Amino acid sequence: MIILAGLGLYDEKDTTLKTVEFAKKADKIYAEFYTAILTGTTIEKIEETLGKEITILDREKVELETEKLINESKDKDIMFLTAGDPMVATTHIDIAIEAKKKGIEVIILNAPSIYSAIGITGLQLYKFGKTTSIVFPEPNYFPETPYDVIKENSKMGYHTLCLLDIQAHNTRFMTANEGLEVLLKIEEKRNENILNKDTKVVVVARAGSLKPKMVYGKIGDLLEYDFGAPLHCIIFTGNLHFMEEDALKYLCENISE
């Protein structure tokens, strides 16, 4: 049996009782933290909560050893952990599919993810369009996909959730400030007037913690704002319902007129 379990968003206290229960019965526990990471805890605290040692796999090992992991679950109970919800990343969906193809039982233990946590802004979840990711630019690599997604969602009046790059192996997490700078550079290149320094966005920091920060304001005002520790994400708002306008006013910190 293979158990795909989510650890939630922030710390070991997000772990569900069901996940703890299955962990105690598991023969072996693996985890990956390259698609998302819990910034409010440590591996040691998670192990203490689960009562088992965890083997951490990097991106290469997960992608290259998926078959090995699945074969191991033919006669053992193998748990595979990730931050957030286990079925958000395509890698985990692939594991579930391949296991099912081989007749292996698959148990999925859902958990809070950024897709549910952005509700703390008061924006209505059904009004979000396609999600996009902003990555650190590199030499000969500067994807403009986020710009295109914001553009298309905006045409339909949808909100856009922008996830920010995580390089856990380098302990490097893109800040909202860096993400906004990337988007402004793409705008400067494309010049399609999709966004500018007067565009209002929402920044969410440390969603899932007891003290998340939600800030609503113009990009120009947010560029130098200190949002604190990661993880951050950015939301471009679409057409706002009056209740959403009230939510942004009262639930978020407003820094622009």
From Swiss-Prot:
Pfam families: TP_methylase. It catalyses: 2-[(3S)-amino-3-carboxypropyl]-L-histidyl-[translation elongation factor 2] + 3 S-adenosyl-L-methionine = diphthine-[translation elongation factor 2] + 3 S-adenosyl-L-homocysteine + 3 H(+). Keywords: Methyltransferase, S-adenosyl-L-methionine, Transferase. GO terms for molecular function: diphthine synthase activity. Pathway: Protein modification; peptidyl-diphthamide biosynthesis. S-adenosyl-L-methionine binds at L9, D85, V88, S113, I114, L164, A207, H232. It comes from the Archaea. One of its GO terms (biological process) is protein histidyl modification to diphthamide. S-adenosyl-L-methionine-dependent methyltransferase that catalyzes the trimethylation of the amino group of the modified target histidine residue in translation elongation factor 2 (EF-2), to form an intermediate called diphthine. The three successive methylation reactions represent the second step of diphthamide biosynthesis. Homodimer. Belongs to the diphthine synthase family. This is Diphthine synthase. It comes from Methanococcus aeolicus (strain ATCC BAA-1280 / DSM 17508 / OCM 812 / Nankai-3).
